[in-house]
Amino acid sequence: MKAVIFDMDGVIVDTEPYNMRRVYEYVHFQQPNAKLEDMYQNAGRVKKDVWIRIASVIGQNRGWEETRSDYETNWKPSHPFEIPYKEIFRKDTITILKWARENGMKTAVASSTAYEKVKEILTEVQVVPYLDVITSGEFFERSKPDPAIYLKTAEVLGVSPGDCVAIEDSTAGITAASRAGMKVIALKDDRFGFDRSLADDEIDSLGDFIEHYQRLINK
């Protein structure tokens, strides 16, 4: 293997519960019958796909752009919500990145989140110096589970997709990396019912990654 590629939300930082809860509060205000579980399929997807689904759950014959605009303009300013990124940062990320560099491997993040937000979060948790490439789903017409973001990340790194291992947690992310032809090690998260069947291996924590990676490539 020549590269390790991380997803960000749910892997490097445990943001999924915060993101889902924040949006769910808005959705539930608009549609009292909505359930938190309705938000689970949003994990790992770009904003457009997320808001298409949210608009569908809310109903009211509003398009996704109008729904998102209402959320950003009217809801968010009156409902402040801070995510403690440093507190939910998985510090074993640094261990893996240092190990990868020491073993001649390139490193990247491939996240569905908007690029500036990805940079902001990764800078706050001090991961950026250990990365060769940061790729955002906002630059792609199709989001995870489409493999485009992973294929492009491998291209920018200058390696074959088959020489990459991806660390993912969500169904969409695991599917995207697998479709790109990469090895996939899934970080287990049973809170959201993610399907990990396409992963090559599973880990309970990032601290288990190096051992499982070595076992995987030595099969």
Go through the PLM ranges and name each one:
Residues M1-K2, K98-R101, A114-K219:
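Asp-based, Mg2+/Mn2+-dependent phosphohydrolase catalytic module
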Residues K2-N103:
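N-terminal helical cap/lid subdomain that shapes the substrate entry/recognition surface
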Residues M8, N42, K106, T135, ...:
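Short glycine/serine/threonine-biased micro-segments
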Residues D14, D38, N42-R45, R62, ...:
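Residues at secondary-structure transition points
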Residues V23-Y24, H79-P80, K106-V109, G137-F139, ...:
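N-terminal start-of-chain detector that recognizes signal peptides
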Residues V27-H28, I54, F81-I83, V109-S111, ...:
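Short linear motifs at secondary-structure transitions and domain/linker junctions
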Residues N33, K106, K183:
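Residue-level detector of anion-binding/catalytic polar loops
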